[in-house]
Amino acid sequence: MTSLEELSNIASQVRRDILRMVTKAKSGHPGGSLSSTDILTALFFRVMDHDPATWTRQTAGQDAFLLSAGHLAPVLYSVLAHAGYFPVSELATLRDFGSRLQGHPSTEHNLPGIILPSGSLGQGLSAAAGIALAKRLDGDPHRVFVLCGDGESEEGQIWEAAMFAAHQGLDKLVAMTDWNGQQIDGRVEDVAGLDALEEKWTAFGWNVVVADGHDFSSILQAFEIACAAANGKPTMILFQTEMGHGVDFMAGTHQWHGKAPSEEQCAAALAQLKETLGDY
């Protein structure tokens, strides 16, 4: 079992990967990738039942993960690489022409770990609900995990999927929201506020867990609660996070939602993060 210290070390390296990938590509979304790093690190290295050696897009016999907030591709690519889905060295190809690591997850080049393309915000939760229903019909007891953004939650399709999943009683569906309070145009509360988000999901018939998205003990406890749920309801984990977490000048501002750092800024950011697993 991966220890809390090991999770912290993996997360530090993932954050370094994110910064180096986006800087080289001169394009990408570092802010939300940094805020969701701890969540995906815990999920892939402690929670999910998955095996890169036998993984297929059908995910038969193992848990499934979808990234609904597809612009957070850098964090997913790094986590997948360190989990053994493809060589870590391939991270250097983010957004290159012909690369398997497109700016948003794509199935065009058959990158292991990617079930469906994503990036058109709001669609991933619907897809995850469909996969959860399919697993139930197939007699597969495994779970489906999906990560959404809080800005993404302004999309109407999120709430259509919420109704569908609750109506179908999909208690093997675990959704997560990276609740960092920022989106491309500013603070979420200023753009289209998500007041009473916990109450909204409860009203839609979901189990709701609120957790600190940067504390591994809190994250793991939230997943434990979600995975133990067997009451005929899907579960939403609202992870309270900070945009750009881990880098002081990126933290807590929407300015780094979709902006690549310069070489100098990247160096300053990397100086704040331990190289724990070795840079690619």
Where are these regions (language model features)?
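Glycine/aspartate-rich loop-and-adjacent alpha/beta segment that forms the canonical ThDP
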Residues: F216, Q221-Y280
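N-terminal capping segment at the start of a domain
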Residues: I10-S27, D178-N180
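Thiamine diphosphate
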Residues: L111-G113, P117-S120, L125-A229
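Histidine-centered active-site/metal-ligand motif
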Residues: H29, H71, H104-T107, Q123, ...
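Non-catalytic, mobile gating and regulatory segments of ester bond hydrolases
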Residues: M1-E6
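Short acidic, glycine/serine/threonine-rich loops at helix termini
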Residues: Y77-V79, S106, Q157-W159, D185-E189, ...
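Cofactor-binding active-site loop characterized by glycine-rich and histidine/acidic residues
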Residues: I18-M21, L34-H167
